[in-house]
């Protein structure tokens, strides 16, 4: 049995145990049984590994990885981890099935190997650290000291921390009496430095500003303990074996070039990481600083020894160019390109193709990223054109399109099946599988239809051929092949039923008895259930038929099991498109009539079971909301807001499915504009109307993590709906109220900073809430919703303070604040509750009597006699300083009257509150003392499943992306681990480039294509110029020689995608036109002004930047034609600036910019090489030769380094210099290389 199979079995056991909520002893017993079966299978296979208890290591790796992938930690996982290390807590005597599986050092190594230094992982890291902390202390304080030279420890260290690109899939072996200084010993040196760097990641968390109270974290303390007891000894051991190898006469005992290069790279990385940690460390931590300085000295010695080895090998450099050229020719057929053709006519049922990383990332963009549909469609067009451009000349356009459709189907089916297979990580995560099912059945046919329509309208595209058949011919061929080869995965999509048995039966059918036995081993240990089935095949085929992309007769006659498929399609309930045909209407017209008249919940249910209509429904719903807004029909808007809110909060998938096809801002901006109306709250007699709308607006912002910078001012043509002074330029340039409110929604403003009018309103509301007169109509008229949103935290603060000071008692407080549970005020409840949760965490816990005494309230509250012994404010004498706030929290949240959307909106703050409470183990038991209604367990049960966001669903299910994109072959792919967790930023770009420069990633074709696709598809959704920033931050001189070819290949792939994007955007760019107008206006103004405005004028002309400025020139990208709902006519004119235009999501990077930036890097590197006159000049010259060889190889291989002129010629009207080939060869990198040579 292979290592991968063993890990899969352990992973399945863990997931099933969690799904069935097995107790710790039962889980441990099953794990012991599975480990014994795996060991027996390995003995039968003759498999042997030098690492003792390898199965225990696999179990530790599985559990640690799963914990680190969870945003919400299941307490059962903590019990499982404790049992794994220490055995069952309930065992008596010595029981073989209740003892530990592995040791604490093994779990610690897996934590260090898998942890990412991101704040989102901190809760999981802390949980693991708390479990292993005591065990580490016991290990290091044991009578027998821990030996870093232990063969098992070194073997596991190398397995986890050695760069897999330098390994040949061989498990290292170490003799028991480890004094040998052979070549196998030296292999552990780079892994030791990687171990130190991993510890530094944990230590850096102690100064992370994004973490609350980082100085209290356990993880940095664990890392310090490990560095003291293991790190120092390990580096001393490495120094010893390197010194021995240096003095050895046998060259075979010296490190080879690959290990030496990796060692020097890791030494440089380690020193950089240590310096970064030292800069952020508290100066008071003198012992820790001294430890890091000591490690710096040890690593410096290792680096010096490595450098001496490198200098001894410089004589071999002269032979490298010839050898490299031979290697390049040998690997030419395996070079990463955008060409990926699969002949669907010859594919067999057993030939399931691997999903290419760029296609997997494209699916991630389409489903998980909430940006405009035009942006997503552009990405589809770009990848197809890149595929077509790189295809063989003999390949017809028909076959390219069919293969591309087949590729999209396979990727969507595989991703959907991977998501369905994963048990939900938390309550509410089940919706993610439904979203993917809807995307597979509704989005893929829509994409194919729109791609075909785009090809119909753009005959001038560089496609090298024509389409001779109708679209249905191509998609039918792709569908036939996809249904054939993806049959098992489609079964998973329809029902995740008994996958272990199914896999075992398939393996047995194919004659793979051993594989079948391994697959069914899991089912022998633990049975599986049977969830309901979903008609995925029927939905997909019906959507294709209704989009005129497939024919019913072709499905019945030409598909495998065609008559059964056709019968399943016929058995579906009548589709909405059929309703439209029977009424003689187009589908969008049908929705235009039904959205205003049908009950929203019933129509949503009908649409949910008809995925082929989701795109039209989403677009029509946005148009309808805009129409209602023009008519000031807030009641209709409120009905749909309430229905969509309930759908999202009750586990439905329709809101998330709608957001696949529209940018959340398209729905948010019109609704947010309601808050800017001058008569808001005065034109409607129904309080629930505004409450439903405003709660839905807040939910949209929360669920889709909408940054306030994306909320723009929106106006309608109806003048009655205009905002206050909407004609004034100042108000047009001001941000909408919602944008400012979200930034300060939980702020309780002091009375002293409020205006006289607001202070009067606060006083009137306090009297209305707690007086006898109640809330009058005059008070409502004087308090628009925007004011209540802003003042609600202050009202809570004043009310709670009044109760604490004895002005009102607790019952009166409850009665007054219960108004916020009613429709009249519920929209203001989220901000007030977030303030309340923060206030509870901020308030020190102390007895109420001490608190009142310190506040000078002894006489007015404490000394007042009462018949029942309570205080004057209604609190018992054993209450605490937090009791009033906790009672209010229980009143408003732990009740059926609390709107479900409110719980969603406060979930993040509630999680922070619970974490703060549970972190203080001494204060937590005293929290509820003196409270009548507060119960933390009951509150947590109420909040279970609340707070689900689209990003949380995507991150929780991100394992599908890593496994699918990595081809299911390299589950430890560092690149895809980074890409699935990184958010595009300067820091993220630096991490990627650092890994590339050292050769840790980017060596194989999948990594190269995956990173290029991420830069061109995923990152631009947040940072439009990510690809250009990537090249800008590359320093060629810092790249390891062995990594240069991979970096050059990635840049070449990026250029290929950008050129394809330029080819598919044939129109001019409005953003570029606006930039040009600004530059001309600035130039005109500068002619009649003094030199005092010279800097401003220069800043407005980025196109005139000097070549040696790292900032790219202003591009002239084509504009993606908006063929759907546009804001052009509705968006209010705003004051534009060059900065805002450059940051626009519509701005695109051009191939000319990337090539010019790459040429700049070449010039700088060449100048640096010529200026070096020391011992490093030989190494730099070798790098330059390698760089030249890599670029020349790509140029000779037909890459588009100097061919970008043809695309720019068509899209930007750049005429060639001499025309044809000569012009191209003189304008690209080839000319630069010739000149510099």
Curated annotation (Swiss-Prot):
It holds the Pfam family Med5. It is found in: Nucleus. Residues 1119-1131 have a biased composition (Low complexity). Keywords: Activator, Nucleus, Transcription, Transcription regulation. Residues 1109-1131, 1202-1226 are annotated as: Disordered. Its main location: nucleus. The keyword Iron-sulfur does not apply. GO terms for molecular function: transcription coregulator activity. One of its GO terms (biological process) is regulation of transcription by RNA polymerase II. GO terms for cellular component: mediator complex. Component of the Mediator complex. Belongs to the Mediator complex subunit 5 family. Component of the Mediator complex, a coactivator involved in the regulated transcription of nearly all RNA polymerase II-dependent genes. Mediator functions as a bridge to convey information from gene-specific regulatory proteins to the basal RNA polymerase II transcription machinery. Mediator is recruited to promoters by direct interactions with regulatory proteins and serves as a scaffold for the assembly of a functional preinitiation complex with RNA polymerase II and the general transcription factors. This is Mediator of RNA polymerase II transcription subunit 5. It comes from Mycosarcoma maydis (Corn smut fungus). The gene is NUT1.
